[in-house]
Amino acid sequence: MKLNEMRKCSLILLGVIFSVSLNDLLGENKYTGVKHIEDEITKERIIKHLDDYRDMISYWRLYPDKFIDYLCSLNPDNTFHFFFYQRVFLRAIMRHRYVYATFVRAWSKSFMSVMGLMIKATLYPGAKLFTVAGGKEQSAGILSSKVEEICKLIPAFAKEIEWDTRGTNAKTRQTKDTVVYQFKNGSTLENIAASEKTRGRRFQAGLMEECVGIDQDVLNEIIVPTMNVSRMINGQVDPNERLNKSQIYVTTAGYKNSFSYEKLLQIFCQSVAKPKDAIILGGSWRVPVVEGLLSKDFVRELKLDGTFNEASFDREYRLLYSLNTKNCWKLLRVA
């Protein structure tokens, strides 16, 4: 369907219907001044514009940054704007099933990764998503802080979450080491433990935060198998749906003889053999410096600091994996 044929459509989004033209939706990503009016959702309205809704949701799944641009346009006091590399990252994690991203400090990797999961939870009703890190309390802190930050910057996201925790049904819960967000469309986003306690759980997609700290056996034997069940649509599975079994690995650089480095090489080989399924992403300190997220003077001072280990600087800011000399020496002695 051409854009001019879809000129006026009522957009169902976040529990309310907004009157907006598709050209406004897909055009320039600025606040248009259009006054959005809340109205009652009816089954008849949904059926009448169902094809239009399908087209828009399909578009947003491929261009998630445009979805965020639209949500921001609903807020006249919006202050959130993407950097170019953040748009690239969002599109990559929505279009590929396997993503390995190695980024430096101040790259906003956790912020963007959690935003990607929230987009998936919104655009894929009934999705079961998780985050995991080396420690459960660590993953709970990352998830809760980033969701809270995103909801403040983009209030429309807050309307997608069931915040009432007083009901008998399990909804949004937040404790020291457990965070569960229940979305109004049936999706859930939670943190899980990198331990035997997670065995038997079922999800469709997950984020491995700071995967350099996750145990190899736990990841392969417990975490990855939780994603063996695909999302059902009307009782059927779409084999082409990118959500199913999608895995995002995010970390800073570590050691070359570690499991995380082997996983990086594995997904790199997958990206060569099947470029539509896997992708490798990376960025040094220069990217956040160019965008103003990191001070160049701060980086220069770190490089000149005699107490700062050069190998640590290479891992944290130059995206260079180090050779673990201790393990290497043990291997030489055994040989």
Language-model segment annotations:
Residues 2-335:
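Phosphate/NTP-binding elements of NTP-utilizing enzymes
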